[in-house]
Amino acid sequence: MMRILLFVATNLAVVLVASITLSLFGFNGFMAANGVDLNLSSLLVFCAVFGFAGSLVSLFISKWMAKMTTGTQIISQPRTRHEQWLLQTVEELSREAGIKMPEVGIFPAYEANAFATGWNRNDALVAVSQGLLERFSPDEVRAVLAHEIGHVANGDMVTLALVQGVVNTFVMFFARIIGNFVDKVIFKNEEGQGIAYYVATIVAELILGILASMIVMWFSRRREFRADEAGAQLAGTAAMIGALQRLRVEQGLPVHMPDTMKAFGINGGLKHGLAGLLMSHPPLEERIEALRRRG
């Protein structure tokens, strides 16, 4: 909770600085001179409320959504020795990472994958696919679990949601400024908000949204390196490299995890060219090389 409060306070400060900066550069005067009566401070607050609301709601219901969309079955009472081993391994890794034991589950998917989610590091969910349990060795599964525990210990779910809230705020803010500019300055509309405002705002939100997604995915790729490092500390560098190499062997298999969950899995799929800027995970080769350099 302290992380959320600190991050929100920081971003309110960013919003305030942005508003003051625009005023100092005479943006308010320029817009007013062209017939645009726009209170930038109020607009920023409005956008911040709605920008953060969506990402924070998603964060607080993330465990429920993950269970629903992936079909994850929570292990409350282990029925097999594999489930017993899974619970014991997660408990051991959680203790080493200094976090409370998360819920543990298995989701029905052939591809080898796993994810962690939850609104804070002491109320999380870690789940692995059936395919991962069936085809990976115990050491490889343990390394994958260590990677996911690393995400939880680092508070990555919270931070990613808050970063998303920040970019949502500025996408909404600048899209509405662009919409007002097009409507009032270019089309000279003097009565309320014309059709040009709505069209320009929608187009601007689409374009700025793509750019914002690149920023969020850049951050997501950075956190994967950090989770790999945490996994190496908990399970050993050799085991973490071995798990990533095994994932690389299976890279041709389609990833059936819902789009909303791919950023939280260990295997985010593969994209090429400009689409690579929208990847939630770095290429496995880069992750393996980073661990080798780490030693």
UniProtKB/Swiss-Prot annotation:
Q: Which GO terms describe its molecular function?
A: metalloendopeptidase activity; zinc ion binding
- The record's free-text note on cofactor binding: Binds 1 zinc ion per subunit.
For the keyword Protease, the answer is yes
Coiled coil region boundaries: none
Q: Which segments cross the bilayer?
A: 4-24, 41-61, 158-178, 199-219
Q: Which UniProt keywords apply?
A: Cell inner membrane, Cell membrane, Hydrolase, Membrane, Metal-binding, Metalloprotease, Protease, Transmembrane, Transmembrane helix, Zinc
Where do the catalytic residues lie? E148
PANTHER family per UniProt:
PROTEASE HTPX
Q: Give the record's family classification.
A: Belongs to the peptidase M48B family.
Report the protein name in the record: Protease HtpX
What would be the name of the gene that encodes this protein?
htpX
